[in-house]
């Protein structure tokens, strides 16, 4: 019982206490071999004055990052993911956002990838509210008319194409049934 409870304690980030997963709480290892979720490490890297050094929140041992290396490039704790029976996803840090591009696997047709983002806070020097000159001004937005290019993109959408194919098949079968009913009625009973 105590061993199982110890494993459950290991399966969560020691900073935010959220359970590890394979998205924004992916366990990343520092040089001291302590694991933290990528969200906590991203927050830590954004507030640290020395951008290339991360101090471990537990033992204070520094982890030196290469020039321009984000915290998402730190090694993933694969042993923890194996314990949780999860496969790692690639999470990237863009500015003050963590981004995850999830591409669902399908055998029959392509699906649009889903992109999940997690905002880590305001940009330094950014404003918290709307700019004062645009807050009082009201701007009327024109009605957008679909262009030739947007319709072309619509036709390239795999879900739309499958829908169009199914509707064409249903319409064809319906017309075939209607004509065959009238044809057999005229041929067999001589109506008309």
UniProtKB/Swiss-Prot annotation:
Coiled-coil ranges per UniProt: none
Effect of residue 101 to R: Loss of autoubiquitination but no effect on ubiquitination of BCL2L1
Induction entry: Up-regulated by ER stress in an ERN1-dependent manner.
Enzyme class at the top of the EC tree: transferase
Zinc finger (RING-type): 13-60
Effect seen on changing residue 105 to R: Loss of autoubiquitination but no effect on ubiquitination of BCL2L1
Quaternary structure and partners: Interacts with FATE1. Interacts with SEC16A. Interacts with BCL2L1.
Name assigned to this protein: E3 ubiquitin-protein ligase RNF183
Gene: RNF183
């Amino acid at each position: 019982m105590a061993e199982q409870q110890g494993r459950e304690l290991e399966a969560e980030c020691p900073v935010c206490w959220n359970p590890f997963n394979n998205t924004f709480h992916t366990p990343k290892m520092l040089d001291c071999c302590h694991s933290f979720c990528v969200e906590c490490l991203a927050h830590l890297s954004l507030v640290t004055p020395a951008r290339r050094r991360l101090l471990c929140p537990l033992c204070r041992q520094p982890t030196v990052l290469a020039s321009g290396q984000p915290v998402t490039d730190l090694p993933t704790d694969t042993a923890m993911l194996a314990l949780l029976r999860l496969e790692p996803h690639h999470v990237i840090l863009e500015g003050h956002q963590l981004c995850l591009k999830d591409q669902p696997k399908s055998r029959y047709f392509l699906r649009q990838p889903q992109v999940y983002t997690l905002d880590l806070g305001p940009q330094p020097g950014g404003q918290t509210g709307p700019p004062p000159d645009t807050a009082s001004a009201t701007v009327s937005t024109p009605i957008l008319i679909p262009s030739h290019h947007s319709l072309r993109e619509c036709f390239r959408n795999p879900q739309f194409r499958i829908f169009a194919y199914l509707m064409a098949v249903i319409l064809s079968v319906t017309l075939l049934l209607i004509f065959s009913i009238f044809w057999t009625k005229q041929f067999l009973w001589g109506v008309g």
